[in-house]
Amino acid sequence: MSEDSEHVLICVAWPYANGPLHLGHVAGCYLPPDIQARYERSLGNSVLMVSGSDEHGTPITVTAEQDGVSPQDIVDKYHMINSKALRDLGCSWEPNVDSRGIEFGGALFNRTSDEEHKLIVQENFKKLLDAGFFERKTTPQYY
């Protein structure tokens, strides 16, 4: 990496792990950032691209009830299927975070249940909270 290179973070959507990915996922949220990551790497930039399976939500519970299994069974199954599908399509999702640390780039397709993921989210939330970026207020909600 040269002195002119930059650190680039590409954050990709985290779809629910309640079923297999479809063409809309690939064209809409995975192919564009993969192209961007490849472009940035071609410029010599250090790129970290992150995404994964969102393992929380009603769609997972509904699928589990329909299949007669636990929500954990559903997310385990579809995280594996979806991460393999993206790699098979040639997307940059091989688990290849640089051994020196995430600041040196790579790709990470993770899970919201991962302990490290939980810690990072909590740390960032606390930093934003302490910096005054959140405001508590009441608003009407229409449903």
Across the structure, where does each feature detected by a protein language model lie?
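N-terminal, positively charged nucleic-acid-binding surface of large information/translation enzymes
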Residues: 2-143
